[in-house]
């Protein structure tokens, strides 16, 4: 027996504590172990007695008021109170609700022992749990049912054990194991189970008699307990069944949704594919419906000299074959010819086209094609260079640029035949004058820029510069670079129009004494070249019986007459030169 137990017994005798109070003091002692379950069961059974109930509760509230180093008194009192609420009389829970403030104050219990360990946390947590249980009546009822069921099972197990009976002394909380007489008989019988149970049957039967309810109240309590347990089991099974049914229904609904979504996606994909194909076929049908004839334009890669690819005109018109070569060609190659469907066509030779008064009417064809008419918006057919002018078609598939006249002069078989003819000033005809800006302005990226003449940048001293001496004869190319020749046709001999029948260049003294100087001076007295009015009619080049080499030089008087008639000064040049800058 320990010193604390001896001291406790002395206090019990001095203070004349009753049996119930002594048991409560023993269960809530300051010993370093918890209260015994058997002792708490005895105290719970005593709560059904009204006198014992008051003694037990008064001692419990007294233990809850301890503090400091007696923190075990408080903690064990809370543990005992929790057990009494669940397994004792219902009056315990009712009195605890009335004095719940005494339990709530224990949430701030503080104590730190010598080792620095916070021992008050055990009391704080236990008081919080107990307050929450007292405030929740439904939870309290459920836990009371479970605790009573557990207590009954423990009692049945204790009555079924006949080998070792655990008994507790009145003055001590430590169990004492006593060997019963049945164990000795079990050893004598050789350990047979039948002899063992037979020897213990009288004792077991007496314990079963004690476990039976003695009063009608206990019998009613056990009946309510059994009904509550069966009801709880049935409700739990029903909840599980409903949960399973709900999960099964959700899974079926989800699978049904998935099966509906997949065909819709397939239908959408199937609808999208034919739609795109139908759009493409509709566009192709519209393009095929437009009339198209003649050769298809071939477009070369601008950065390489690869195989030309076919290019379709979206407007249905015929695009003449154009050769788009390297944008940085080497010396000797011909300039790139770009295809512009709205540009002004050029001719392969320097022949004038008859004047057409109505741009929207059908053009006049030559004698060989007199019975045919041209449609301005229809599909154009390729025609020779001497044919009529078509407003939206090209004669040779190219568009005039700044150097197209020089290409025509180099590739022409009849160089400078129209040197003395006066060009018409109609925008729908092709002029042989290299400096005629009204009809030879190219439809390129800069249509508004005017063509420069020698007088525009040389002024009145234009006749003093011999431009023929600045032009040198380039080396003849190894092969023909004309993209408009038919395959297999013989290439024409390269002719330089600047060096045909070129006389001996005049010296400065000869230029000063020549009559051309006076006439040019009379025309070049102003800051620029005066505007020449268009003549009503111009004879074609073939009507002129003389070439540029057969013209006679004009004197000053003749030049004045020519100026009064409105003939441009380019027609009054000496007959011996074919310089395009002095025409």
UniProtKB/Swiss-Prot annotation:
Residues 165-181, 197-216, 301-315, 346-355 have a biased composition (Polar residues). SMART domains: ENTH (SM00273), UIM (SM00726). The modification Omega-N-methylarginine is found at residue 170. Residues 482-581 are annotated as: 3 X 3 AA repeats of N-P-F. Keywords: Cytoplasm, Endocytosis, Lipid-binding, Methylation, Phosphoprotein, Repeat, Ubl conjugation. Residues 218-237, 243-262 form the UIM domain. A 1,2-diacyl-sn-glycero-3-phospho-(1D-myo-inositol-4,5-bisphosphate) binds at residues 8, 11, 25, 30, 63, 73. InterPro entries: ENTH, ENTH_VHS, UIM_dom. The modification Phosphothreonine is found at residue 453. Residues 165-217, 293-384, 411-457 are annotated as: Disordered. GO terms for cellular component: clathrin coat of endocytic vesicle; clathrin vesicle coat; endosome; plasma membrane; postsynaptic endocytic zone. Ubiquitinated. The modification Phosphoserine is found at residues 173, 192, 195, 431, 514. It holds the Pfam family ENTH. The keyword Repeat applies. This is Epsin-2. The lineage of its organism: Eukaryota, Metazoa, Chordata, Craniata, Vertebrata. The gene is Epn2.
């Amino acid at each position: 027996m320990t010193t604390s137990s001896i001291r406790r017994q002395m206090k019990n005798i001095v203070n004349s504590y009753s049996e119930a109070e002594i048991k409560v003091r023993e269960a809530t002692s300051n010993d370093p172990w918890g209260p015994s379950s058997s002792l708490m069961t005895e105290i719970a059974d005593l709560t059904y007695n009204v006198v014992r109930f008051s003694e037990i509760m008064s001692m419990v509230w007294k233990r809850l008021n301890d503090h400091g180093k007696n923190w075990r008194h408080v903690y064990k009192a809370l543990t005992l109170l929790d057990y009494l609420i669940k397994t004792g009389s219902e009056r315990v829970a009712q009195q605890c609700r009335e004095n719940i403030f005494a339990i709530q104050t224990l949430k701030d219990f503080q104590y730190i022992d010598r080792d620095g360990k916070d021992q008050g946390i055990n009391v704080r947590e236990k008081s919080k749990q107990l307050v929450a249980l007292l405030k929740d009546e439904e939870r309290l009822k459920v836990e009371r049912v479970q605790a009573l069921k557990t207590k009954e099972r423990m009692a049945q197990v204790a009555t079924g054990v006949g080998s070792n009976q655990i008994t507790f002394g009145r003055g001590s909380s430590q169990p004492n194991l006593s060997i019963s007489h049945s164990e000795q008989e079990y050893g004598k019988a050789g350990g047979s189970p039948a002899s063992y149970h037979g020897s213990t049957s009288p004792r077991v039967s007496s314990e079963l008699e004690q476990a039976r309810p003695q009063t009608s109240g206990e019998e009613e309590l056990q009946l309510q307990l059994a009904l509550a347990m069966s009801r709880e089991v049935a409700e739990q099974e029903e909840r599980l069944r409903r949960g399973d049914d709900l999960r099964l229904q959700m899974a079926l609904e989800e699978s049904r949704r998935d099966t509906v979504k997949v065909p819709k996606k397939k239908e959408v994909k199937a609808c999208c594919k034919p739609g795109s194909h139908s759009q493409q076929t509709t566009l192709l049908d519209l393009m095929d419906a437009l009339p198209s004839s003649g050769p298809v334009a071939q477009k070369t890669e601008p950065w390489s000299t690869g195989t030309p690819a076919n290019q379709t005109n979206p407007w249905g018109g015929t695009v003449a074959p154009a050769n788009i070569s390297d944008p940085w060609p080497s010396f000797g190659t011909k300039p790139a010819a770009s295809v512009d469907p709205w540009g002004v066509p050029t001719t392969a030779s320097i022949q004038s086209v008859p004047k057409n008064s109505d741009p929207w009417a059908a053009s006049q064809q030559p004698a060989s094609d007199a019975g045919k008419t041209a449609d301005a918006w229809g599909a154009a057919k390729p025609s020779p260079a001497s044919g009529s002018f078509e407003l939206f078609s090209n004669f040779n598939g190219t568009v005039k640029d700044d150097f197209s006249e020089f290409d025509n002069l180099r590739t022409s078989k009849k160089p400078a035949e129209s040197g003395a003819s006066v060009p018409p000033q109609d925008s729908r005809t092709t002029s042989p004058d290299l400096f005629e800006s009204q009809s030879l302005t190219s439809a390129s990226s800069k249509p508004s820029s005017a063509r420069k003449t020698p007088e525009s940048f040389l002024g009145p001293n234009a006749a003093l510069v011999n431009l023929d001496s600045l032009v040198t004869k380039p080396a003849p190319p190894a092969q023909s670079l004309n993209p408009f020749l038919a395959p297999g046709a013989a290439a024409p001999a390269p002719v330089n129009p600047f060096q045909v029948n070129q006389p001996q260049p005049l010296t400065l003294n000869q230029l000063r004494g020549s009559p051309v100087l006076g006439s040019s001076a009379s025309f070049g007295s102003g800051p620029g070249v005066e505007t020449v009015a268009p003549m009503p009619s111009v004879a074609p080049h073939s009507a002129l019986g003389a070439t540029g080499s057969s013209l006679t030089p004009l004197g000053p008087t003749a030049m004045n007459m020519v100026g009064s008639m409105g003939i441009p000064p380019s027609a009054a040049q000496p007959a011996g030169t074919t310089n395009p800058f002095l025409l």
